[in-house]
């Protein structure tokens, strides 16, 4: 199966789609007016210290102060001696920072909703093969590099470039890479860090010291270890910029770059636009006839699996098992496609067979292993729910593309026509007792107004008799179903 990246560029927006086997697996979107700031380094100033929350707010020049927890401040632990095994405890925030103090911080989570960005003082600088860790003295290796001999080789090579400036983490893409390429990467990261430290010496505060790469370059860097067959770009300027970027940092990717000039929009090649639309819906259909219901809330994401129309096996246990197995693949894809993070609760269809539960869990873990974002599956809880987490750094596709519904205000439901009709009648009675008027005029949405004139007309007539006044109903086309006004005449 082929894998490729499609880069779609307009003056205000860049979108990158990752296609594997002809199917959209990931979509990355960046808008000029709302560029993500994860990875950016700032010189900020502590604006508030909150001992009760073990946190501080830091002004880094954004609209909202950013959040810094004590556990994200380095050095953030101290050893408690006198026990058989060492324990590490987070030091009190008041001992670590003070109001008005200048700090160099890095953004680890974009602002989301009412929350400001989340920060750390544990700075890291990523490149193609390495991650530079200022102040560290060790070399770490990605767990995805399984060969022990290769891990040792890489550690030995990279250890030579560790000094007082910092240490390194060796990324998965470094597997099999020669010493020259690793040395070049290490030197590049140290040059970047030197520039950051020079900028930090400036007397002013609340400004950016380092900016993460633009979306297209960042995705190419992060996909450097992926087996891509081609990278198609529909913008000449972006294509040339990526040629320059890959020629310097990822030369083997250069030959895969193509400037797409076809008449058909680039995303139409793989039905990407429709896939994006489907990724905004709650319901995800499974090929078997079953389906998922995905609900994203501020606290967590929940996924519910249902058999739906799937009755393909005589044995109910087998039907449930096969639906759950199919669901694991769909869930893993949807988490990547929608960029869902944080706590995720999965409600598989109940299984009494312990072997079936074990195999479903294994299938989920295998499907998630393809995810480039860190995931952790905790297994089935006592209530039969699977609890897992997925690292959240950037906004989900829903938060990028959608606003809160102005009708239901994020509830996901609106009051029924019947409910609104009865609210209007109660309001008429309330106003009648409070004020003097000759008659009432009700403005309501088309559906509610029609109901008041139709099936609820008898109830409205009883209200007229009770208040002793005429009630006239008028349609207001611009009102949503819950809106109405009762006007005294």
From Swiss-Prot:
Q: Which regions form coiled coils? A: none
Q: Where is the S1 motif domain?
A: 39-128
CC per GO annotation:
cytoplasm; cytoskeleton; plasma membrane
Q: What class of enzyme is it?
A: hydrolase
- Positions of region (Required for function, when replaced by GVHSRDDKQAGALHRTPADFRSL in mutant BUMMER, cells accumulate 16.3S rRNA precursor): 244-489
Result of altering residue 171 to K: 34-fold reduced activity on 5'-PO(4) substrate, 2.4-fold reduced activity on 5'-OH substrate. Binds 5'-PO(4) substrate 65-fold less well than wild-type, kcat is nearly wild-type. Has wild-type 16S rRNA in vivo
Cofactor names from the entry are: Mg(2+)
Q: Which GO terms describe its biological process?
A: cell division; maturation of SSU-rRNA; rRNA processing; tRNA processing
Main function: An endonuclease that acts in the processing of the 5'-end of precursors of 16S rRNA, generates a precursor with 3 extra nucleotides at its 5'-end (which is matured by Rnm). It prefers 5'-monophosphorylated over 5'-OH or 5'-triphosphorylated substrates and cleaves single-stranded sites rich in A and U residues; contributes to RNA turnover. 5'-monophosphate-assisted cleavage requires at least 2 and preferably 3 or more unpaired 5'-terminal nucleotides for cleavage. The optimal spacing between the 5' end and the scissile phosphate appears to be 6 nucleotides.
Q: What is this protein called?
A: Ribonuclease G
Which organism is this entry from? Escherichia coli (strain K12)
Highest classification ranks of the organism: Bacteria, Pseudomonadati, Pseudomonadota, Gammaproteobacteria, Enterobacterales
Q: Which gene encodes it?
A: rng
């Amino acid at each position: 199966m082929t894998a490729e990246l499609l880069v779609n560029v307009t003056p205000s927006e860049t979108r990158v789609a990752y296609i594997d086997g002809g199917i959209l697996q990931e979509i990355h979107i960046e808008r000029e007016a709302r560029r993500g700031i994860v990875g950016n380094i700032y010189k900020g100033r502590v604006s508030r210290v909150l001992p009760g929350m073990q946190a501080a707010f830091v002004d880094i020049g954004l609209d909202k102060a950013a959040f810094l927890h004590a556990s994200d401040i380095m050095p953030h632990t101290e050893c408690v001696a006198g026990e058989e095994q060492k324990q590490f405890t987070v030091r009190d925030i008041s001992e670590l920072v003070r109001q008005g103090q200048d700090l160099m911080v890095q953004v680890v989570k974009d602002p989301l909703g009412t929350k400001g960005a989340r920060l750390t003082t544990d700075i890291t600088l990523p490149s193609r093969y390495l991650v530079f860790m200022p102040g560290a003295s060790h070399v770490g290796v990605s767990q995805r590099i399984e060969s022990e001999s290769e891990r040792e080789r890489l550690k030995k090579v990279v250890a030579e470039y560790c000094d007082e400036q910092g240490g390194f983490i060796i990324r998965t893409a470094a597997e099999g890479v020669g010493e020259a390429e690793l040395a070049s990467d290490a030197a590049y990261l140290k040059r970047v860090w030197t520039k950051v430290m020079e900028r930090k010496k400036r007397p002013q505060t609340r400004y950016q010291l380092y900016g993460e790469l633009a979306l297209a370059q960042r995705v190419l860097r992060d996909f450097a270890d992926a087996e891509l067959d081609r990278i198609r770009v529909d913008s000449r300027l972006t294509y040339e910029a990526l040629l320059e970027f890959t020629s310097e940092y990822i030369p083997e990717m250069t030959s895969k770059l193509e400037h797409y000039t076809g008449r058909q929009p680039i995303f139409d090649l793989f039905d990407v636009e429709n896939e994006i639309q489907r990724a905004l819906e709650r319901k995800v259909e499974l090929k078997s006839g079953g389906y998922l219901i995905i609900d994203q809330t501020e606290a967590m994401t929940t996924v519910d699996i249902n058999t739906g129309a799937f009755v393909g096996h005589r044995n109910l246990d087998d039907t449930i098992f096969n639906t759950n197995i199919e669901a694991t693949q769909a869930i893993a894809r949807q988490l990547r496609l929608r960029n869902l993070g944080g706590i995720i609760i999965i409600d598989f269809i109940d299984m009494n067979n312990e072997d079936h539960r074990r195999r479903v869990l294994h299938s989920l873990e295998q499907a998630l292993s393809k995810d480039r974002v860190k995931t952790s599956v905790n297994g089935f809880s006592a209530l039969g729910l699977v609890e897992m987490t997925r690292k959240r750094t950037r906004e989900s596709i829903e938060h990028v593309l959608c606003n809160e519904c102005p009708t239901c205000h994020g509830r996901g439901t609106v009051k029924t026509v019947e409910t609104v009709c009865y609210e209007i009648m109660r309001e008429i009675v309330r106003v009648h007792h409070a004020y003097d008027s000759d008659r009432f005029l009700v403005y309501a949405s088309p559906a509610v107004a029609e109901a008041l004139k139709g099936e609820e007309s008898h109830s409205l007539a009883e209200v007229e008799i009770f208040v002793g006044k005429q009630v006239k109903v008028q349609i207001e086309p611009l009102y949503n179903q819950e809106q109405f006004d009762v006007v005294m005449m």
